[in-house]
Amino acid sequence: MAKQEYKQLPKRAEVHSATEQFKDTIKTSLGLDLFKGLGLTIKEFFSPSVTIHYPMEQLPLSPRYRAVHHLQRLLDSGSERCIGCGLCEKICTSNCIRIITHKGEDNRKKIDSYTINLGRCIYCGLCAEVCPELAIVMGNRFENASTQRSQYGSKSEFLTNEQDAKNCSHAEFLGFGAVSPNYNERMQATPLDYVQEPSKEESKEETPTNPESNKGDENV
């Protein structure tokens, strides 16, 4: 291993007299480093601002931003989209979703309780991806501070207002977990049950290569 050579700096001369102390103060205060720092400060002072006055001003968020969950209702009818299948509870990696259901008179699951522990949630979005009815989606509300713990995870905080859904005062959700824009042509039963689009090779095989030969066959 190579031997390291250390360079010893000369010791600073001790200042005793008042004149020497005054000279040392002037040299330290009015040195070149001080003017460099002041020049940088003045330059940044007159440069355009890159910050905003939060919370009076807020930057726009991406529609696929993953923040506090949002439970949706069906438009026009106002009924809850959730069917109580429990897929979101099963796929949750942080075990923060809890659903309690019972079977109703029509042999359909009825939801007794639906809670999300926001203190454990990691906002991965798996619950929104696996939901077959687009009942739970990831919203853009990231300001969820509260003084009471009971307000974290109650269903009423996540669920869409019934009157807003009936009046169609908001558009269909297009953020994280939403279906593709052409879902009307591809959807069969549920939002995640799509018709597979034909590949390029299959479309080429279906397209006739020589239309004139086909016409001759039809005439025969």
From Swiss-Prot:
GO cellular component terms attached to this protein's record: plasma membrane
Fetch the Pfam families from UniProt: Fer4_7 (PF12838)
Q: Give the EC number(s) under which this enzyme is classified.
A: 7.1.1.-
The alphabetical list of record keywords is: 4Fe-4S, Cell inner membrane, Cell membrane, Iron, Iron-sulfur, Membrane, Metal-binding, NAD, Quinone, Repeat, Translocase, Ubiquinone
Q: Can you tell me which residues bind [4Fe-4S] cluster 1?
A: 82, 85, 88, 131
Q: Where does [4Fe-4S] cluster 2 bind?
A: 92, 121, 124, 127
Concerning InterPro entries, the annotation shows:
4Fe4S_Fe-S-bd, 4Fe4S_Fe_S_CS, NADH_quinone_OxRdtase_chainI
Q: What class of enzyme is it?
A: translocase
Q: Quaternary structure per UniProt?
A: NDH-1 is composed of 14 different subunits. Subunits NuoA, H, J, K, L, M, N constitute the membrane sector of the complex.
Similarity comment: family membership: Belongs to the complex I 23 kDa subunit family.
Task: List the HAMAP family hit by this protein, alphabetically.
Answer: NDH1_NuoI
Q: What protein name does the entry list? A: NADH-quinone oxidoreductase subunit I
Q: Which organism was this protein described from?
A: Helicobacter pylori (strain HPAG1)
Lineage of the species this protein comes from: Bacteria, Pseudomonadati, Campylobacterota, Epsilonproteobacteria, Campylobacterales
Q: Which gene encodes it?
A: nuoI
